[in-house]
């Protein structure tokens, strides 16, 4: 075995002082990343599978001269408070057809096939449809959800004034309109949650990387080559990330029955639709460790190039004000392409806006830190301000996911309609709640890992301050202030920036009705402050112990 590989595995087994907490934080954060990535992939594929089973109902581009059937859909009826869809189907080529998905034979005029939920309530519908008993029950192969309410009724013909749709195949690759809308919404959701997830990946890698930075710098100064140092770090991070990915996959599998209860797209999911496939497992087991290793190696760039700078504690160079120019690109693109309803450019625009927040964040933290240091009237404010100025990237990294969640909250606060009976609005509300849940889980994991990482990062300066006579209480208070200030000073403007991007996309229209948007924004602020406060309290013992030696 390669000596550096063996040494890396030994460091995982025996991480040294402070290493166990760092490894556990990195492991837990990576497990959350794997669970979220699996959920997003499986959910997107599940929508595709749901659409494949019912896509033929939306087919309307077939040539009437060659079509196998004509359709007319009425989805405005109700049964026991549930929306009921009635699909009239006229078969144009009865001798050439296999039955539609989920039906045991092609419906003849007067025959009625119903979903299981409708079959349970048929006694109240029999008189209306003139059939005492349904011809058959549609199986799960022909339904988008076990809770779908639909009647497929065979008719002789559909008149032209009903504007029939024409279908050329039951297996035609046509997206159901509702599933397609959900998939587009999921794409926007993925873009919005992507950067918090990437921040969590970076945080997971950074916690362990920061702990090993001085150790690897010492190895570098002792004669280890740059390649050896990077390989050692990659091995250590890959083992932690792979273990976290496995736990995340197992966690998703265990939670699948609960996830299937989410009533999106007209009802709950079939568990089989969101069950992970072998290639999904492979993607997660490869992608999560690779991203984690890359993040760790980027964080150790200083070690491989200037190890003496790490040991001497050299500060990083200042950040350019040019970063703020990125804030303009996203809103302008959203305003321009929002009018054109071009999905891909809009996804890119949302990504640019979120990226701008991530890139501008450290610069804004440094700006706030300079103002704090200049206006400091005590040691706590001065120490906190200098911390933000000296290492703005390090100060922003633990709260990056939280700040980005503010962008997400501000963005979606514009899109919270209150139409109770509209299925699209209902899907939107559930989607917003689901997106916020994913973001909050990401933020909680990132903040927890960041608390440990920040404590270990500040161990050396805190140790020096304690030796020079600075009280531990002052050091801990300064650390808490340095954690809260980026959330307030940067996070609140980012919430407004997110709302601005949402308004740019909607053409300046506020889709949200009532006070739900304001309550959502207030909830974001309160949740953010609570998370940072709890994280600071959790990180204090780690800082106290790490700076004691």
Task: Show the residue positions of the predicted features.
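Small-residue-rich transmembrane alpha-helices
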Residues: 202-205, 241-266, 282-305, 487-512, ...
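Hydrophobic alpha-helical segments
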Residues: 239-352
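Extracytoplasmic/periplasmic regions of membrane proteins
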Residues: 7-12, 39-190, 196, 408, ...
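Hydrophobic alpha-helical transmembrane segments
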Residues: 184-192, 277-290, 431-437, 520-529
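Hydrophobic multi-pass inner-membrane translocation pores used for secretion
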Residues: 1-37, 64-66, 115, 159-170, ...
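Long, hydrophobic alpha-helical segments
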Residues: 187-204, 438-445
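Transmembrane helix boundary and interhelical loop/hinge segments in multi-pass membrane proteins
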Residues: 4, 201-218, 222, 451-464
């Amino acid at each position: 075995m390669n000596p550096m590989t063996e040494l890396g595995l030994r460091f995982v087994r025996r991480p040294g002082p402070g290493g166990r907490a760092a490894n556990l934080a990195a492991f837990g954060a990576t497990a959350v990343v794997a669970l979220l990535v699996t959920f997003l992939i499986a959910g997107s594929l599940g929508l595709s599978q749901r659409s494949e089973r019912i896509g033929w109902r939306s087919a309307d581009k077939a040539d009437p001269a060659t079509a196998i059937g004509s359709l007319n859909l009425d989805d405005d009826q109700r049964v026991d408070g549930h929306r009921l869809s009635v699909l009239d189907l006229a078969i144009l080529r009865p001798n050439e057809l296999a039955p539609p998905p989920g039906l045991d034979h092609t419906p003849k005029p007067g025959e009625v096939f119903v979903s299981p939920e409708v079959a349970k309530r048929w006694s109240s519908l029999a008189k209306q449809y003139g059939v005492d008993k349904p011809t058959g029950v549609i199986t799960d192969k022909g339904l988008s959800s076990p809770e779908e309410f639909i009647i497929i009724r065979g008719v002789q013909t559909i008149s032209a004034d009903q504007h029939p749709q024409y279908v050329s195949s039951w297996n035609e690759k046509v997206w159901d309109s509702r599933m397609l809308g959900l998939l587009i919404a999921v794409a926007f959701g993925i873009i919005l949650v992507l950067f918090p997830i990437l921040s969590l990946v970076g945080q997971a890698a950074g916690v362990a990387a920061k702990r090993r930075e001085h150790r690897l710098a010492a190895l570098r100064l002792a004669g280890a080559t740059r390649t050896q140092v990077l390989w050692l770090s990659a091995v250590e991070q890959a083992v932690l990330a792979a273990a976290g990915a496995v736990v995340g996959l197992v966690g998703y599998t265990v939670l699948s029955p609960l996830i299937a209860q989410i009533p999106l797209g007209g009802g709950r999911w079939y568990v089989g639709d969101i069950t992970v496939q072998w290639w999904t497992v492979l993607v997660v087991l490869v992608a999560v460790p690779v991203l984690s290793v890359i993040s760790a190696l980027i964080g150790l760039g200083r070690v491989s190039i200037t190890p003496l700078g790490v040991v001497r504690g050299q500060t990083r160079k200042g950040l350019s004000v040019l970063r703020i120019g990125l804030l303009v690109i996203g809103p302008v693109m959203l305003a321009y392409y929002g009018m054109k309803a071009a999905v891909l450019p809009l996804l890119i625009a949302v990504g640019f806006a979120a990226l701008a927040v991530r890139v501008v964040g450290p610069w804004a933290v440094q700006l706030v830190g300079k103002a704090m240091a200049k206006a400091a009237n005590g040691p706590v404010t001065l120490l906190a301000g200098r911390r933000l100025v000296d290492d703005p990237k390090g100060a922003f990294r633990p709260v990056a996911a939280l700040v980005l969640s503010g962008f997400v909250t501000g963005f979606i606060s514009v899109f919270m309609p209150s139409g109770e009976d509209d299925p699209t609005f209902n899907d939107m509300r559930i989607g917003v709640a689901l997106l916020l849940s994913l973001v909050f889980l990401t933020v909680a994991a990132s903040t927890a890992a960041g608390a440990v990482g920040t404590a270990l990062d500040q161990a050396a300066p805190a140790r020096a301050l304690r030796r020079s006579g600075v009280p531990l209480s002052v050091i801990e208070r300064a650390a808490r202030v340095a954690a809260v200030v980026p959330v307030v000073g940067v996070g609140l403007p980012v919430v407004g920036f997110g709302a601005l991007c949402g308004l740019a996309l909607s053409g300046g229209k506020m889709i949200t009705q009532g006070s739900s948007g304001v309550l959502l924004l207030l909830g974001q602020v309160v949740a953010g402050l609570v998370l940072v406060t709890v994280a600071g309290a959790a990180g204090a013992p780690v800082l106290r112990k790490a700076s004691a030696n």
